[in-house]
Amino acid sequence: MKENLEIDKGIPNSLLWVLAILAGVSVANLYYNQPLLNMIRVDLDITAFQANFISMITQIGYAAGLFFIVPLGDLLNKKKIVLINFTILILSLVVIGFSKNIWVLFVASFLTGVCSIVPQIFVPIAAQYSIPKNKGRNVGIIISGLLAGILASRVFSGIVGEYLGWRTVFFIAAVFMLISTIVIMFVLPRIDPTFKGNYRGLMKSIISLVVKFPPLLIYSSRAALAFGAFLAMWSTLAFKMQLAPFYASSNIVGLLGICGIIGALSASFIGKYVKQVGVRTFNVIGCFLMFVAWIIFILGENTYGGIISGIILLDVGMQCIQLSNQTSIFEICPNASSRINTVFMTIYFIGGSIGTLLAGIAWKINKWHGVAYASMILIIFSLLITIVERLMSKRH
């Protein structure tokens, strides 16, 4: 499977699907904690806000990893970067499993976030080395694997946490990462860097990309705001489901993650039609679906039908926004794909962290309704960026 890759010459399907699977396995580490937050709160005797902070600091770690580590994909051997990150992940997951102190858990969660950025090294590989007509499709395959990992992580952690304890989830996750490390050693070919220079010059070039290509900031910001509204739901769902009339345990919260499978299945379809339909149209559709989802979350807050319908719409809407924007950014400057993706995903997860923080505050003030109103405001701002961008493009 170790074939040399050349830009725009194509990527073997076997390698593509291995990367998609490993993208799912590695990104899952960001989301294992979400169905377990209430269990962790009880076990460590902490407040709901402190438990919510575990999720937020994991997202902040991911944003930091995106900004400081992913750009190295243009400067160093990508395979070496992946192996180092996987090794640190194994250690941080084990530490989480043994954590008795909230501050140790915070630090280990941050490191887990930092080193879970590997899927964002795989995405540029798919974009850069696929033949032009397959770029959207192949990026969609990686994203589908990533989404499947997110969905499976919540289901897995919810069920395992309920029956074997929340700590066992992270020990098993460490084993998954050990297996992933071995797979990467054997299947990922050497991919030479495209940037000539040092790390300082590389980081400076990231800033210059933002200045040189204004659409990059537009694509990133509107996706980030939507992602904030998306994570607001998942970071507080465990608290919502423990209350009347559900009184649900972590395994039920995890199983609700299956509802997002429609979003995962839609990723490849969306990637295929981004050029034909247009990124703006997908953004409007995505914002509409997410806004309706939160209305359903309010009206049907005490029914499984309302919760499930809301999750499905929220997930599909999020994929419309993320994938259309992320696919489009790689056309801006193909030779800087890792750095372009760094800007997008760093801003994207900053938005997710802000959404998680706002959700924690909103939950404290007005529980589920507070989270809903905060999320709807984020979605409106995301839509406004698309509307303003459309009006400005007409003027020019």
How would you label these PLM feature ranges?
Residues 2-10, 188-220:
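Juxtamembrane intracellular "pre-TM" segments in multi-pass secondary transporters
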Residues 45, 77, 98-103, 115, ...:
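Helix-breaking motifs and short loop linkers at transmembrane-helix boundaries and internal kinks
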Residues 64-102:
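Conserved MFS/SLC helix-loop-helix module at the cytosolic interface between two early adjacent transmembrane helices
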Residues 66-77, 265-279, 363:
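Helix-to-loop junctions at the C-terminal end of transmembrane segments
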Residues 108-144:
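Cytoplasmic helix-loop-helix junction between adjacent transmembrane helices
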Residues 141-188:
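Helix-loop-helix hairpin linking two adjacent transmembrane segments in secondary transporters
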Residues 280-325:
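C-terminal transmembrane helical hairpin of 12-TM major facilitator-type secondary transporters
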